[in-house]
């Protein structure tokens, strides 16, 4: 994209993709700029599309930028920034996973970070127990009524992730070209790249483990916002 001279020239670490060039209008708010970053780098599998899930920090000292103040009033030309994920508070009786793990809904590209484990995949429902453990809320989907409120649970033991079915509603685990495995009440190991299929709801979720990719070559073609 091309940019005018009125834009700020910035360098941004987009999660594991380091030192990327960006051009931004100084009048943009942080959420507007983050939204543009998410669109520009949508090829990153574990990068979501909801600006409020992220914040921008100054690379020099980790100071977060203020969401309500235009970026031109907070940083100058040539500034280095870091895009980071906002952590959600831990529910009681849960732990942080040992790695950054995600489920990516294959049709829309929506990314759900599993901020705790055990993590429930299903639908938020205040009337049901363990509502605070729902890390993947599929309620907004048009086929959500075919998803159980407490459908699946993902846990970790010794660095290995497992998935089990908490409901009578079927789910399948797809791995490469292997025959699909039914997910039952007996935990199955989860591997990076596995796809969890909720067949009745026509929803497929890819399991992604963020290992920390090697530093990407700096981009000399700045994205404009």
Residue ranges and their predicted role:
Residues 122, 153-155:
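Conserved positions in beta-strands of structured domains
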Residues 17, 106, 146-148, 182, ...:
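Residues that act as N-cap/strand-start positions at coil-to-secondary-structure junctions
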Residues 179-203, 208-224:
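C-terminal regulatory/effector modules of DNA-binding transcriptional regulators
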Residues 53-67, 151-152, 159-194:
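Forkhead-associated
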Residues 123, 165-166, 175, 200, ...:
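Residue-level recognition of conserved beta-strand positions in structured domain cores
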Residues 1-21, 25-26, 31, 35-143, ...:
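Intrinsically disordered, low-complexity acidic Ser/Thr-rich regulatory segments
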């Amino acid at each position: 994209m091309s940019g005018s001279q009125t834009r700020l020239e910035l360098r941004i670490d987009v999660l594991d993709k380091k030192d990327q060039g960006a051009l931004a209008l100084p009048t943009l708010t942080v959420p507007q700029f983050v939204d543009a970053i998410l669109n520009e780098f949508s090829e990153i599998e574990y990068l979501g599309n909801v600006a409020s899930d992220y914040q921008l920090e100054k690379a020099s000292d980790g100071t977060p930028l203020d969401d309500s103040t235009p970026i031109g009033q907070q940083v100058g030309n040539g500034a280095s920034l870091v895009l980071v994920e906002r952590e959600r508070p831990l529910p009681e009786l849960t732990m942080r996973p040992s790695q950054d793990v995600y489920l990516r809904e294959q049709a829309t590209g929506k990314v759900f970070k599993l901020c705790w484990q055990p993590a429930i995949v299903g639908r938020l429902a205040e009337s049901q127990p363990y509502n605070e453990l729902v890390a993947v809320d599929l309620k907004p989907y048009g086929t959500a009524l075919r998803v159980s409120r407490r459908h699946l649970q993902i846990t970790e033991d010794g660095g290995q992730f497992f998935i089990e079915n908490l409901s009578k509603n079927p789910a399948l685990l797809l791995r490469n070209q292997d025959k699909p495995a039914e997910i039952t009440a007996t935990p199955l190991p989860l591997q990076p790249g596995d796809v969890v299929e909720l067949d009745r709801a026509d929803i497929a979720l890819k399991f992604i483990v963020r290992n920390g990719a090697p530093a990407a070559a700096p981009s000399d073609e700045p994205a404009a916002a």
